[in-house]
Swiss-Prot record:
<protein>
    <recommendedName>
        <fullName>Basal body-orientation factor 1</fullName>
    </recommendedName>
</protein>
<dbReference type="Pfam" id="PF14988">
    <property type="entry name" value="DUF4515"/>
</dbReference>
<dbReference type="GO" id="GO:0007026">
    <property type="term" value="P:negative regulation of microtubule depolymerization"/>
</dbReference>
<keyword id="KW-0175">Coiled coil</keyword>
<dbReference type="GO" id="GO:0044458">
    <property type="term" value="P:motile cilium assembly"/>
</dbReference>
<feature type="coiled-coil region">
    <location>
        <begin position="271"/>
        <end position="361"/>
    </location>
</feature>
<dbReference type="GO" id="GO:0030317">
    <property type="term" value="P:flagellated sperm motility"/>
</dbReference>
<feature type="compositionally biased region" description="Basic residues">
    <location>
        <begin position="1"/>
        <end position="13"/>
    </location>
</feature>
<dbReference type="GO" id="GO:0005930">
    <property type="term" value="C:axoneme"/>
</dbReference>
<feature type="coiled-coil region">
    <location>
        <begin position="85"/>
        <end position="201"/>
    </location>
</feature>
<keyword id="KW-0966">Cell projection</keyword>
<comment type="subunit">
    <text>Interacts with MNS1 and ODF2.</text>
</comment>
<dbReference type="GO" id="GO:0007288">
    <property type="term" value="P:sperm axoneme assembly"/>
</dbReference>
<dbReference type="GO" id="GO:0036126">
    <property type="term" value="C:sperm flagellum"/>
</dbReference>
<comment type="similarity">
    <text>Belongs to the BBOF1 family.</text>
</comment>
<feature type="region of interest" description="Disordered">
    <location>
        <begin position="1"/>
        <end position="22"/>
    </location>
</feature>
<dbReference type="GO" id="GO:0007338">
    <property type="term" value="P:single fertilization"/>
</dbReference>
Amino acid sequence: MPSKGKDKKKGKSKGKDTKKLIKTDESVVDRAKANASLWEARLEVTELSRIKYRDTSRILAKSNEDLKKKQCKMEKDIMSVLSYLKKQDQEKDNMIEKLKQQLNETKEKAQEEKDKLEQKYTRQINELEGQFHQKAKEIGMIHTELKAVRQFQKRKIQVERELDDLKENLRNTERIHQETLRRLESRFFEEKHRLEQEAEKKIIMLAERAHHEAIVQLNDAGRNVFKENDYLQKALAYHLKETDALQKNSQKLQESHTLLLHQKEINDLLVKEKIMQLVQQRSQIQTLQKKVVNLETALSYMTKEFESEVLKLQQHAMIENQAGQVEIDKLQHLLQMKDREMNRVKKLAKNILDERTEVERFFLDALHQVKQQILISRKHYKQIAQAAFNLKMRAACTGRTEYPKIRTFDGREHSTNSVNQDLLEAEKWTHIEGNVDIGDLTWEQKEKVLRLLFAKMNGCPSRKYNQSSRPPVPDYVVSDSGETKEFGDESKLQDKIFITQQIAISDSSGEVVLPTIPKEPQESDTGTF
């Protein structure tokens, strides 16, 4: 019997649990429906705000497109004005260059009358340069104004960029705000769900405990009252939670509404500022256009005046050029006469030089012959002196005589007894009086005589020869060893004695003609010396 009572109690408790589960499922469904209706209302509100923002963005895009079209038109007009002004400047520069070229040509043609005409042309050129500087200043003013327009355009672009940056910042802030809201909402719902689960678990635990205690203590009527009280408490807690959530959502919506109103006010202010700036820009562009028109009229008037002055100057220059051309023809005729006279003088000078070159060749051949004789005689003297020295040394070796003084034959500088000292004695003019026959002189003295004759014939001052110096020998003379030797600077200076090697004659064609003198003198008969 007690086992049957226990089974009945267990069946009753299971039925009660199923009823409670059904009730909790119904409450969850009701909550889900309430949440769905709430989110639908939110979605409708956001859709309405999105439609409004779309309309405003379309209106702003249209206004931006209109402003861009106007800006492009204004830029095209400004570029056309700039190109027209640049073309006019280029044409003026070309005209100025042509006039300068014409002036240079007139100066080249009239070289001799340059001093007379220079004063007139300088005055006229100064006047033209003054006008040109004035025009350049005016053009510079135009350029400065155009630069101001360009700076204004650049400033406009910068302001537009700043607007775009502000819009992007606003969008970023909105996006960040929405993300933070989403995060907070997700956290809130997670915490809410977790707390609800914990509360439900605790309530279930408490309810089970209370239920068991109530079942034990109360009768049927008390049990019904307890159940109703429990149900009412749950409903009240649920409604309180819903009211808290609705209050929080209403606060968030109010905050977002205030933010949107603030952004709208900022956008309205920015649009008003841009409209004011566009109005100012239009007024400035109109004033600049008026200035450009006035400057164009002034430039056209000044160009006409400049062209008329240029025509007058060209006519005056043509008349003066014709007069100068007549005088140039006369001078050219005189120059031709002078050229003929110069050609005659050149022919005479050439004939004289040809005759002189023959004499110089004769002297060169004589000098060459004398130098060769000097070399031969010196070589022969060295051989005889060396043979005599060798004989004395042999005799001294046998003991018949004493040893002679040491003598050198290679011409060393520090030698005290050299053969070259005997050779230098031949150059000295000792024991020679007036009316000397040239056949009685040595070969070295004959060479000096020939050089003095050359110097006197060419009008050059006679040079003093150092008696201790080596006798001059030309570069082409062969020494004892069969090799060519270069002797000092006198062999180079002797080539500068001759007049035919110093004077260059130019004929009428402008080419330089030098007399042909051979470097190596030809052998001639020098029997007279």
